[in-house]
Every structure is written in C-alpha cells, then in structure tokens.
Amino acid sequence: MLSIKKDLLSALAIALEQLSPGAGDKAAFESPKVAAHGDFACTAAMQLAKPLKQNPRQTAESLRARLLLAPAFERWVEAIEIAGPGFINIRLKPAAKQETVREVLQAGAQYGTQPTDHERKMIVEFVSANPTGPLHVGHGRQAALGDAICNLHATQGLDVWREFYYNDAGVQIHTLATSTQARAKGLKPGDANWPEPAYNGDYIDDIARDFLAKKTVKSDDREFTASGDVEDMEAIRQFAVAYLRHEQDLDLKAFSVKFDNYYLESSLYSSGRVESTVQRLKDAGKTYEQDGALWLRSTDYGDDKDRVMKKSDGTFTYFVPDVAYHLAKWERGFTKAVNIQGMDHHGTIARVRAGLQAANAGIPAGYPDYVLHTMVRVVRHGEEVKISKRAGSYVTLRDLIEWTSADAVRFFLLSRKPDTEYIFDIDLALAKNNENPVYYVQYAHARICSILTAWGGDESQFGHVDLSPLASPQAQALMLLLAKYTDMLSHAAAGFAPHDVAFYLRELAACYHSYYDAERILVDDEAVKLARLALVAATAQVLHNGLAVLGVSAPRKM
C-alpha cells in the first residue's frame, strides 16, 4: 500500500495547492485517534483556515470536493468524511489494503527498507566499556540499543559502522593490574596486604590463574601470552586487559552483537591526535591560559562555563580526548554520529560539541547525537537481585542471558524508552504466556509457520492469488497495520526509538491473534483459503523483519 499512499498524498498536495498556493507541503496523513473513524486522518484544512480567513469546516468541505475528483482517491478511497472542527477522515477500499499483502510478499526481508547509499555514512559508538570487569546489565541495555539503532538506520539506507571505544590505560586499568597482581601472589579480598582500591570479583582470580599458567588470549585481532612474572606490572596489565576484552567479546557474541572496529583511547595520544586537536583549538583562538591551566572558550558555544583542557600539572582533562576522537570520526567521513551512553554522561554533551564547533572543521552544531539510557534493575520472585558472585558487586549481562535467553534480554531491554528506568523481571522473561512480550510475538510467528506447514503447499503462488475474500473487519485491520510498518521504521529511526518497533510488534501479534480467533485459515473453499494464507504469510514476514531489527530470532516452532 506504500505506492497507494504516495499517490494519495500527491493528490492531496495538488488539492492543497489549488486551495492555497504553497500549501502543498502540508500534505500529510495521521492515524485517527479512533480506528472506527477511518484509516487516515488529515488536519490540513484546520491549518489553512486562518490564512484563508474561512471557517475550518468550510475549508475542509472545499478540500473534500477536490479530493473526490482526484483519480487516486476515486480508485482507492471508499469514503471521505468531515468530523469535528475540520478533521478529514479517509476510509480506504478493501482493495487498497489488500495491495499491502502483495507488497510484503514481493519484497520479503526487504519490506520496509531503503537501498543502501554508501555516501550516507553513519557511525554508532556503544557499549565502550573499559576492560576492568564483566559487562553488566547496563552495558547489556546499551548493546541492545546500539545494535537496534544501527539496524534501524540500515533499513533507511544508511551505511552504518559499529564502533567500540575503550581506555586501555589510566587509573582504572592500574587498579585492575594491582588487583590481578595481588591475586597472583595468593592474596584475597580482606587480607592485610590487599590493595585499595581494588576489584574483588572472582573474575580477578581467573585472570591471575591464567597469567601464572602463561596462557595466551586473543582479543581485538591481537594475541597476548602471559609471562607469569608477578613483578612485571606491564605484562600483568596487558594480559588482564586482553583477558577481559576477550571475556567481553564472548558476552557480546552470546548477545549476537558484532562491532566493525575497536578504537583505543591510548591511540589518540600515541598518534598525536590529542596534541594536534589542542593546537588546532589554540590556532583558532578558542583557548586561553589562566591559573597555569589551558581553558576552552566553551561558553561561546552554549556551554554553561568554560572548561579546563589542560591542567596545571600538564595532564589533559577527560573531555579533550573525546573531542579528538569525535573530530577523527568526522574526518573519517562519518557525517552522522550517534553515541549510546549512560545518563551519567549528560554533562559531557555540551563541552564535546563546543570543542568540535571551536575546531572550525565544518561540523554541524548538533554533532554527535546522543542517546542516553538509565540503568536496569533485576528482580526475581519480587525481590531485587543485586550481586553476582562472578562480578562481586553487580549482575552481569552473561548472568541475565544464562538465566533467561538472549532473545528475552534483547526484547525486554528494548521495550521501553532508553531514558526510562527498566525493571527486568526474570520470572516474566521465563513465562510461556501472553504476559511475556517476547514470547507473545514469537509465538505469533511460530503459529503462522505451523499453519503454513500443515497446509504444505507452494507459497510462491501467494503473490498472484485473488485477495478479495479478505474483507472482514479483522482482516482489514491486520492489513492496515502491515501497511504502517514502513512509516513506523522511518519514525523509529529518526527518533532513535527501537522501543517503537517492540511496541509495533506486540500490536501486530495481538492483531494477528484476533484475526486467527475470528477466521479459520485452512477452510475448504480454495480461493478463501489461499487469500487467508497469503495474509498470514505476509504477517509472518513482517514479524520476522521487525524482530530482526531488534536482533531477536523468529522461531518457526515453539
């Protein structure tokens, strides 16, 4: 129905131009607040009434008269009604909705997507966890969000690049090394000589054991072999970082998340990018010295105060490598960049953007985009689960996957807006009933597959069958919802809102179950049976496509 909607919008734009030159850009359809009022709603008449100095209903009547004469409306529209102060409600003919079934079956896995344009490059940075411990459930939410946002924008034709940025040096990494060294020397948390601060989880003992055994670990396309020398802090640091990066990769693999590149913060220093970025800002006249420190004039770009770039002791503040890193993203050709980060990073947004603006590199003011998320609470039997033995102080992503499933974790973590606190209910994730959203959606897909298997015919004929038997209210509602998939993807991508996809899939599953309860599929009448089979096959395809965007499987059997 996508082509039909375009034809109708084109006719609406022409009619609006006839009413008021320049008004064609107001051509748009909305979903009626009450489904019984129609399939599309249009508010353009109310927008035009004031400049035309007319009563909105009078403008709506004039617009309706023009639409009734448009060939596209004559062919595909059953009724045009005016309601309230000037709403125009449009009801489509059954044949218009039936076209959706053909479009879905013809496009298959590509339904709702745009061809990839390699000139539109987008980079999404997410997870970006420092290698100091296992990934926690907050990282899991970030992994699910980042991967789904990448998938969403890929459906819109963008060439998407997934990147993981982490720090392999600094205070946290030093703490990791001293903790591992202490374990390798036989110490444990609570002992007199146990270092403070330290990481106390059992995973530190695992690293120390493998270090002493001189094992080899591979991460980020590099191999590290442990020396076994408990006095060699640099060897311990390198091995511990590689070990935990490998462990994080195993977690991400279990979650079906793959990255195109891993970017080391230390490379920004070794390559001279940090120094060159600072020099660039100096040359642009955007810095000044005060109290022995170097400051950025970030208030010139909307920040609430100027920021220290280089402290009096000669070290850089943490946002300087961030500016250098994002400048590198732009120079690598990524004209669109998105960062998925925890809510605690909110304070860095203005200063990073200010630094990029001050660099005079032609970077847009809103670069990069940010999606900030809250943390996740985990409950079981109504009580919060706070501690993992392996991590020592938090529930890990691997725990959650092992307790439930990767599909459940993905769908659950994507079912709410990122900035909304999420409570992950383990009991609900394990439930095999309609209260479990991922089970409900996957079951709809599996139910359709079982019907198609029971039928056992050639599905390739669905694209040519007579769809006129699909006239019941339930069939019409299902086809209209299938037709909304493309626009839903577009809006979800624009708003970085994979939760919209999860909501749509639940709505589609509910609509399918209602249809299934209302009409038997495998009836004796061959024409009716084939039409209904075509509809449910199209529904299965859209369920499959939407689940794929979320990174969730679509099982054929359950």
Curated annotation (Swiss-Prot):
Keyword Metal-binding: no
Record-listed E.C. numbers: 6.1.1.19
Subcellular location: Cytoplasm
InterPro entries referenced in this protein's UniProt entry, alphabetically: aa-tRNA-synth_I_CS (IPR001412), Arg-tRNA-ligase (IPR001278), Arg-tRNA-synth_N (IPR005148), Arg-tRNA-synth_N_sf (IPR036695), ArgRS_core (IPR035684), DALR_anticod-bd (IPR008909), Rossmann-like_a/b/a_fold (IPR014729), tRNAsynth_Ia_anticodon-bd (IPR009080)
Motif ('HIGH' region): 129-139
Single GO BP term: arginyl-tRNA aminoacylation
Principal location: cytoplasm
One cellular component term from this protein's GO annotations in UniProt: cytoplasm
The keyword Lipid biosynthesis appears for this protein: no
Cross-referenced PANTHER family: ARGININE--TRNA LIGASE, CYTOPLASMIC, ARGINYL-TRNA SYNTHETASE
NCBIfam families to which the protein is assigned, alphabetical: argS
HAMAP family on file: Arg_tRNA_synth (MF_00123)
Subunit structure: Monomer.
Name assigned to this protein: Arginine--tRNA ligase
Source organism: Polaromonas naphthalenivorans (strain CJ2)
